[in-house]
């Protein structure tokens, strides 16, 4: 079992992700990590959550009144996000391209339209006013040794397109490295690699 209290260096394998139904029941999500232990997507009682999902058609997004969201398109050509902040307001439309972290509040009406086919996304949920989230895409050059100064209480490195070597061992594409604060060595192979780096911190 993943122990997120210990902040130890470990790899979460794709085979360990938990399949769950979207809150609105219109699709599925692969849950990578959730905190605290025992929290669930259905109850919405989590402080933070990491997940990935495939979106194959235009879809409304589930509402999460107590959470902020960051979405990153891992595969696919992009989406149009539409938000309505208040009933009766016109929608705000934003185009989101691949590997562009996109932040939006979870307590508003949101939907997406696919620009050119299905996408796979990565989502970070953080409890509003309680958890701060930093999300960035890091591209490693071929054979590069990258030292990640992971500053959050909880930190994760997701291998987007290729496997990399880490202080915890090999991190295959689609797997996630979990660690506490400190320096972590991430080494790309001869073809380079792209990583998604997530740091989460308790506020106040």
Regions from the language model: what does each represent?
Residues 1-204:
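Jelly-roll (double-stranded beta-helix
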């Amino acid at each position: 079992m993943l122990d997120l209290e210990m902040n130890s260096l470990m790899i979460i394998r794709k085979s360990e992700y938990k399949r769950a139904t979207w809150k609105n029941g219109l699709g599925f999500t692969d849950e990578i990590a959730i905190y605290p232990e025992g929290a669930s997507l259905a109850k919405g009682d989590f402080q933070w959550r990491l997940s990935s999902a495939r979106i194959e058609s235009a879809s409304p997004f589930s509402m999460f009144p107590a959470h902020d969201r960051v979405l990153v398109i891992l595969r696919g050509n992009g989406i149009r996000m539409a938000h309505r902040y208040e009933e009766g307001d016109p929608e705000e439309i934003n185009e989101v391209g691949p590997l562009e972290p996109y932040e939006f509040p979870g307590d508003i009406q949101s939907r997406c339209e696919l620009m050119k086919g299905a996408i796979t996304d990565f989502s970070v949920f953080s409890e509003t006013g309680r958890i701060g989230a930093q999300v960035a895409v890091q591209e490693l050059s071929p054979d590069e040794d990258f030292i990640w100064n992971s500053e959050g209480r909880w930190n994760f490195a997701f291998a987007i397109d290729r496997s990399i070597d880490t202080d915890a061992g090999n991190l295959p594409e689609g797997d996630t490295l979990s660690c506490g604060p400190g320096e972590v060595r991430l080494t790309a192979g001869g073809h380079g690699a792209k990583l998604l780096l997530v740091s989460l911190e308790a506020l106040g």
